[in-house]
A protein has these predicted regions:
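Bacterial Sec-dependent N-terminal signal peptides
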Residues: 1-24
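Beta-sheet-dominated interaction scaffolds and their linkers
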Residues: 21-48, 54, 125-128
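Hydrophobic core residues within well-ordered beta-strands of beta-rich domains
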Residues: 45-47, 86, 102, 117
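Buried hydrophobic-core signal for structured, non-transmembrane domains
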Residues: 47-53, 90, 104-109
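Short, acidic/polar linear motifs in exposed loop/turn regions
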Residues: 54-57, 96, 112
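Surface-exposed binding patches on compact interaction domains or structured appendages
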Residues: 56-87
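Short, hydrophobic beta-strand segments
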Residues: 88-96
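Terminal connector regions
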Residues: 98-127
Length: 128
């Protein structure tokens, strides 16, 4: 009975380990973008975060959530094949916001080995 239980545990562990080796994995070129200093006369700025699926299975972005309504992410919902690149476009709209330094986060959730990654945008908006 002990041998059977031990063999079953080893089989489950082995299958779990093998499945983990065939996961998707997201790798971003950069995780922070600095818009620098800009005037509140021109409050809308955009950037693109580029990533690669360095895993062995298709990468699916399940959800992207920004920390503020002033930050709008957009992305292609199709799976990214292993070795392929994808992008996440982020628009910051500082209209009606107080001048000064800001730092916003964008949380990316995937089916990858690391399920959650945080991206950041920051800058300084000057007043009139």
């Amino acid at each position: 009975m002990k041998k059977f239980l031990l063999m079953t545990l080893m089989l489950v562990f082995g299958l779990t380990f093998a499945a983990a080796q065939n996961q998707a994995e997201i790798k971003f070129d950069k995780v922070t973008y600095d818009f620098g200093t800009f005037s509140d006369d021109n409050p809308v700025h955009k950037t693109t975060f580029t990533f690669t699926n360095v895993g062995k299975a298709p990468l699916v972005i399940n959800q992207i959530v920004a920390s503020c309504g002033c930050t709008i992410p957009s992305y292609d919902k199709r799976p990214i094949a292993p070795g392929q690149k994808g992008t996440i476009d982020v628009t910051y709209n500082g209209t009606g916001k107080f001048p000064g330094h800001f730092k916003k986060s964008i949380t990316v959730r995937t089916n990858g080995k690391i399920e959650m990654t945080r991206l950041y945008i920051e800058g300084v908006m000057t007043g009139k």
